[in-house]
């Protein structure tokens, strides 16, 4: 058995493994023992390293070759010094640089009898130095073969021979001894400029608001406590007032009367239409056009839903599979959008009036506070919309039922997954009406909006005016035998943004307690004697103050001192990036769920809007300016008059209709000269009779007007359109007079030829609007007459 040991192991008696593979090793052959007292040293090649094999046995002394008897220690001490080597590994037995044959015949080392355990060791620095020289030569040869193109200078600073040192960060030169550095002042000349003198001429009346705090500050007005005229049972109920005064009839719902009747008629018509099978081709062409028109893929419709296999649920085919051409086209979908309050109450009231009894109808309501995913609701809603609900089998009544989807514009990414796909599937198979309510119509799929618009089932509910809400609240309080201050009641309506439910809760909080003392407080504007003069200086001073106050208002608008909590359901970039992680499990997705929106919300804690109870210095200064310059307050008071607001709305509607009737370019009377257009000539004749064609209106006019503010419409658009309407009215009157002058001796049958001849000769002037301009003129005069009455 052979073992590999090092020379240090032999000298020290330790047996350990060799650390390096390229080190010289000694092999001891235990099986083939040599003669006692000798070392049989032989070499062998293992890979690239030389190994010495020593046949070790009991070492016996041999005859000395030299007469000088030296021990191993003395031999090493008299050996000349070799070059130092960087490597400090274990000593190795020197192998001669001669031929391999000489390496196998190793000389025997004589040992003296006095030192039997000593072995002559020769330093291996020569071998190590030769190995290092060979390695260095290989590196040099490798570098010679490498081209200089492989090494590129990464920076221009490597080409410089010298680099200037950077400026020291600290002072490196100090004065010698006790001398201190003397400071020297240097004058730097600046360009000469003159500063105009600031001469402000202030009047004592300008500081009246600071001298007299009682007249300038806001005086709290204490309203009277609610007067309870009697003991009313309704006041002691446990119900909230919105539930107590819930509308019972359709007339009590605070929505536009004409719109309520249109919605009721559509729901009634849908119930009668759905009693028979109907076609849904409009829907199928929009959500799945390949299914109706054919697809290039033969296996596009290979997987067929179970509902399509049931012939009873397919409304557009007979049971034998043949198409029914006599069926009507109808999809039971209605979209109710807008900022009005009470959409759900409106549907419930209409269903109660249609059914005639609370037990004869059923509304399946889907709210935003529940999981509205496709897997949670599709099967339940399909069962409800494709089967009849029978409450009492003995009395089989024709029950009425519909599905009401509330707040469809508020959708969560994970909780409401597959929501719109579920609604599309219900529209395809439902035998009951589907009603969708929302505020923002832009978050509803365009396919459903276009489908509802084609069927005249897209309804917009407008916000109710404050006067209507005030009248209803007065009626409710009167039924409860409660009297309140009218000014305070108007403030309640304005504070709650004309929301009837919030107003009722506000009133219940203050009026239900018989011991209520303080209702509210109001800021009374200071009454000052100074008014705005007619001089340019006064007007300039007012405009400067208003401009400065606007700057203050913009600077303090988003500077709230109250730190508000950030809504965890808001769609932020952090939430979107979190959902892009593929390793996110379903539980974490539900935890970090957010509302789907068409824009990302950036939460800036340093830009929070002012709360209603925080100090608004901009509003305070504005009130002071309005109190000082009375004309501003009078103008605002005139504009706040609801009677004038209604007139302004009518004026704006007439302006919009007039602009929408704009004749396209190259489509006026000049085109009639080249070709005889009977329809255009007929329109001209009708205009002479006072009949105007408003069928072809430009829809872009309303979109362009949406970007304008109310102030721009009042000050710029309406006056400008009024001047255009006056000019257009004069042109049409002149054309009418010219036509009447030339048609005295012409029969009525030849009126078209006469108009064509006059247009070719250029006698008739061009008109640019099809609408009646006199309507705009009348609305403008009606509006200004209202201003003159309120002065």
From Swiss-Prot:
Q: Which residues carry this modification: Phosphoserine?
A: 6
Which cellular component terms (GO) are annotated to the entry?
chromosome, telomeric region; cytoplasm; Elg1 RFC-like complex; mitochondrion; nucleus
* Biological process terms in GO annotation: DNA replication; DNA-templated DNA replication; double-strand break repair via homologous recombination; heterochromatin formation; mitotic sister chromatid cohesion; transposable element silencing
Disulfide linkage: none
Primary location group? nucleus
Q: Which family does it belong to?
A: Belongs to the ELG1 family.
Q: What does this protein do?
A: Involved in the negative control of telomere length and in telomeric silencing through a replication-mediated pathway. May have a role in Okazaki fragment maturation. Required for S-phase progression. Component of the RFC-like ELG1-RFC complex which appears to have a role in DNA replication, replication fork re-start, recombination and repair.
What protein name is recorded for this chain? Telomere length regulation protein ELG1
Q: Which organism is it from?
A: Saccharomyces cerevisiae (strain ATCC 204508 / S288c)
The encoding gene is ELG1
